[in-house]
Regions:
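Alpha-helical membrane segments and immediately flanking helix-loop junctions
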Residues: 257-311, 338-353, 376-379, 383-398
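Transmembrane alpha-helical segments and their short flanking loops
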Residues: 312-419
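Membrane-water interface of transmembrane alpha-helices in multipass transporters/channels
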Residues: 32-39, 77, 179, 215-223, ...
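Signature of multi-pass transmembrane helix bundles
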Residues: 2, 6-10, 17-22, 29, ...
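Transmembrane helix-bundle signature of multi-pass membrane transporters/permeases
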Residues: 46, 63-64, 83-88, 161-164, ...
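Membrane-interface alpha-helices at helix entry/exit sites of multi-pass transporters
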Residues: 74-82, 189-196, 284-300, 328-329, ...
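Transmembrane alpha-helices that form the ion-translocation and gating core
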Residues: 89-114, 227-260, 264, 271-274, ...
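Juxtamembrane helix-boundary/capping and inter-helix hinge elements in multi-pass membrane proteins
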Residues: 68-75, 110, 169-174, 182, ...
Length: 419
């Protein structure tokens, strides 16, 4: 059944490209094409709204149950510390890889495109959280507000307090925890219904993009797009290689398990769309719910490997396009700045572009350079989102391994599910 759905999603993607290209040829006027694309993308918008509808209750219910089953705050702190060690290391590697590749490949040199005026506006609101604001932002003013706006990190903080409180109450909170566990099963059932719409959403997403952009934009920006995806493939290989060192050949089984959420994230350009399915597939590795429900939502705020690599790659690409030379020391400073500013951008629309805009301003690089990549950002976001799924999957599995879970036993079909 899983391979059948994956095949249908692939078919939907291919059909979407064909239909989008036909629409682009039939209606070359940009205004008309945009109107048609808006109607087509309605299916994708509805699908993503359905996914966002279940994320808050899914994170809350699974995390509360997981923490309650841990039984003590020491376990929570230990797992959180191990997860953060991995997140920081993976983010630094991703940023560094982007920096090295853009210096070696130099995609911004000899760019056969007119450069935007340095004073041109990008219409992006450039904001970055200070460390003080970021720490304050971790704590929700209201859990209702946090759930309404899908502030994953704030939901995680509230759920941790709730789960620890339930664990401390022991038997008195048992029925409440059991009820919340049943709620998580209900939400996962809803997820199953929503996932049946995934092929339609993928079809609509691809058709809408190609209708407005056409395939020609990939030719115009071919060098930049190809070199960026080359970097992503290197990052995938690096992550899988680390997985091989830890899990042996079972790392390939882990990658095979997440092919469906990977494809879903790629085709919809949304990591969130793959979140419920990623949880489900990780249980089959198997990884315990308490680890998945804790580490995975944290990863969506702290472990966006694809986005991290893109930030350094795109920022230095724009600098190269304007013939601005940044010494190695400044590039390392930029890397560290990106490491900090990106952590406050979880849940911000087009977060990578906002982070890049803030970084450009900090290093006196024309913010208008963003106009060079805004047109193809959707195509690049597809790769970033898929990479984030791989990174968070591996992070969750590694933390489970560090916690002593037997996550790579043979004959998975013969083993009972880990609670």
């Amino acid at each position: 059944m899983r391979s059948r759905l994956t095949a249908i999603i692939l078919i939907g993607m291919i059909l979407g490209i064909l239909v989008g290209y036909a629409c682009h040829i039939l209606w070359p006027d940009p205004a008309t094409a945009k109107t048609i694309a808006d109607y087509i993308s309605l299916f994708t918008d509805v699908f993503l709204r359905l996914i966002k509808m279940i994320i808050a209750p899914l994170v809350f219910s699974t995390l509360v149950v997981g923490v309650a089953h841990m039984g003590d705050t020491k376990s929570v702190g230990r797992i959180g510390a191990k997860a953060m060690i991995w997140f920081v290391g993976a983010s630094l590697v991703s940023l560094l890889l982007g920096m090295v590749l853009v210096n070696l490949l130099r995609p911004g040199d000899n760019l056969n495109l007119p450069l935007p005026d340095a004073q041109a506006s990008t219409n992006l609101k450039v904001t970055s959280l200070s460390m003080k604001e970021f720490v304050a932002h971790l704590v929700p003013r209201s859990i209702v507000e946090a759930m309404a706006t899908n502030e994953i990190l704030q939901i995680v903080v509230f759920s941790l307090f709730f789960g620890v409180a339930c664990a401390s109450m022991g038997e008195r909170a048992r029925k409440l925890v059991e009820g919340i566990e049943e709620l998580s099963h209900v939400i996962l059932s809803i997820t199953g219904y929503i996932m049946k719409l995934a092929p339609i959403a993928v079809f609509a997403s691809m058709a809408a993009i190609i209708t407005t952009q056409g395939l020609g934009i990939l030719v115009t920006y071919g060098k930049f797009v190809l070199e960026f995806y080359f970097g992503l493939v290197l990052l995938w290989c690096l992550l899988i290689a680390v997985g091989f060192l830890i899990f042996g050949h079972h790392s390939f089984r882990l990658v095979n398990l997440i092919r469906e959420p990977f494809l879903l994230a790629f085709s919809t350009a949304s990591s969130e769309a793959a979140y419920p399915k990623t949880m489900e597939q990780l249980e089959k590795f198997p990884i315990s719910k308490k680890i998945i429900s804790f580490v995975l939502p944290m990863g969506y705020s702290f472990n966006l490997d694809g986005s991290m690599m893109y930030c350094t790659f795109a920022t230095l690409f724009i600098a190269q396009a304007y013939n601005i030379v940044l010494p190695l020391g400044q590039q390392i400073t930029m890397l560290l700045l990106l490491m900090l500013t990106s952590k406050g951008m979880a849940g911000v629309p087009r977060a990578s572009l906002v982070v890049i805009a803030a970084t450009l301003a900090s290093f006196n690089i024309p913010e208008a350079g963003l106009l060079l990549i805004i047109g193809i950002d959707q195509f690049l976001d597809m790769g970033r989102s898929a990479t984030n799924v791989i990174g968070n999957t591996l992070a969750t599995a590694v933390v489970a391994k560090w916690e002593g879970e037997k996550v790579h036993l043979p004959e998975p079909a013969l083993r009972p599910r880990v609670a």
